[in-house]
Amino acid sequence: MPLPVSITTLLLDIEGTTTPVDFVFKVLFPYARDRVADFLATQGADPEVQADLDLLRQEYAQEAAAELPDWAGEDAIAAVPYIQWLIDSDRKSTGLKSLQGKIWEQGYVSGEIKGQLFADVLPAFQRWQAAGLAIAIFSSGSVQAQQLLFGYSEAGDLSPHLSGYFDTRTGPKREAASYGAIAAQLGKAPAQVLFVSDIPAELEAAATAGFQTRLSLRPGNATVEIGDWTTIHSFDEL
């Protein structure tokens, strides 16, 4: 189904929408998990890293999970078991996402990591931009991680095509208020924004806020209940 004429902005999820799910789980997560101890040993005194650790400690104090690992000691390295537990649990922790972004930056800059995108992403970005449409990202990954993925992608630097990045600091992806906040920051009426995601609960929140939506059905995505959602298999359909 072509884009509705009322749409002026596309708001895109990353995992399962612009990027294969496997890239996140088989490349990014293991990269951060394997390197977090060395990273904290060398960068743990950095004020920005300390801010991430302070946030993680606040989250740790509120955890109720029975299998929660110990966080014993004040030095940065003491946080490693909890951080690895969060990664293994795929927790949407703001502190974790921020710290992961800093670790991934080293991989992207060194060339060890290249952001993976579906083949239709760059042509779609070029087409939408030529049509005068704005493109923004909303992901549970930190803004820094988003900028790295698109700035160091296999298709080159796609950042000139993007006009905004939003993460969980704006709000949870499954709460309508988050989408209202994004529309306000973009300076758009909610009905002018099309949100594309592979998660129906996120689409529900966006629709509640007045956004138009599309359910992304990409290869490798988890099976979901399609229900009444309008679906796409490729950005070629938009």
Swiss-Prot record:
What does the note accompanying the cofactor annotation read? Binds 1 Mg(2+) ion per subunit.
Q: Which GO terms describe its biological process?
A: L-methionine salvage from methylthioadenosine
Keyword 4Fe-4S: yes or no? no
Question: What keywords are annotated for this sequence in UniProt?
Answer: Amino-acid biosynthesis, Hydrolase, Magnesium, Metal-binding, Methionine biosynthesis
Q: Which Gene3D superfamilies match?
A: 1.10.720.60, HAD superfamily/HAD-like
This protein's pathway: Amino-acid biosynthesis; L-methionine biosynthesis via salvage pathway; L-methionine from S-methyl-5-thio-alpha-D-ribose 1-phosphate: step 3/6; Amino-acid biosynthesis; L-methionine biosynthesis via salvage pathway; L-methionine from S-methyl-5-thio-alpha-D-ribose 1-phosphate: step 4/6
Stored Pfam families: Hydrolase
Q: Does the keyword Cell membrane apply?
A: no
Under the GO molecular function aspect, what terms does this record hold?
A: 2,3-diketo-5-methylthiopentyl-1-phosphate enolase activity; 2-hydroxy-3-keto-5-methylthiopentenyl-1-phosphate phosphatase activity; acireductone synthase activity; magnesium ion binding
Per its Swiss-Prot or TrEMBL entry, what cofactor is needed? Mg(2+)
* EC code(s) of this entry: 3.1.3.77
What catalytic reaction does the record list?
5-methylsulfanyl-2,3-dioxopentyl phosphate + H2O = 1,2-dihydroxy-5-(methylsulfanyl)pent-1-en-3-one + phosphate
Subunit note? Monomer.
What family does the entry list? Belongs to the HAD-like hydrolase superfamily. MasA/MtnC family.
Describe its function: Bifunctional enzyme that catalyzes the enolization of 2,3-diketo-5-methylthiopentyl-1-phosphate (DK-MTP-1-P) into the intermediate 2-hydroxy-3-keto-5-methylthiopentenyl-1-phosphate (HK-MTPenyl-1-P), which is then dephosphorylated to form the acireductone 1,2-dihydroxy-3-keto-5-methylthiopentene (DHK-MTPene).
What protein is this chain from? Enolase-phosphatase E1
Q: Which source organism does the UniProt entry give?
A: Synechococcus elongatus (strain ATCC 33912 / PCC 7942 / FACHB-805) (Anacystis nidulans R2)
